[in-house]
Amino acid sequence: MEHLPRLLLIDDEEPFRETLAKRLKETGYEVLDVGSGMDALTLLDREKIDIVITDIQMPGLSGLEILSEIRAKHIGVEVIMLTGHGEVSSTVESMHLGAYDYLMKPYEYEYLVVKIQEAYRVKRERDQRLKKAEERSLLDKLESSWSPGRRI
């Protein structure tokens, strides 16, 4: 079985958050869930998260503000917006800020799972490219510091 991503679910509506977290866990995901943007950012600094699923309209930090912070500090994390906020401007802004996708509530659970798996595939491919680039950079540095006859 393919490794499943570690998820962070952010939604201020506790019944919705708990129900979705429970269902995702039953599907096999490891899920952390919080009710505020500030709690989410604190958790992101402490934990390894692969994918964030966040609402947009929340007290304190909005989902868009959370997305901006993630893009600034946690580039390797994919973000799926899952919201009842259906304005086209929010969708466009989310995508411009770097969201992987934008899903409307109510949603089809199976479709969300497909989007999670797609986002995780994109994340893994990007992580592999970054690792190869870092290895190439290290090899280039080693080669440039080496000269014939020099003992290392």
Whereabouts are the PLM-identified features?
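Receiver (REC) domain active-site loop signature in two-component systems and cognate sites
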Residues: 58
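C-terminal output helix
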Residues: 107-117
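Short hydrophobic/Thr-rich beta-strand motif most characteristic of the beta2 strand and flanking loop
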Residues: 28-35, 43
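CheY-like receiver
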Residues: 122-152
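Short amphipathic alpha-helix used as the core "switch/output" element in two-component signaling
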Residues: 42, 64-75
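Acidic catalytic/metal-coordinating carboxylates
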Residues: 5, 35-39, 62-65
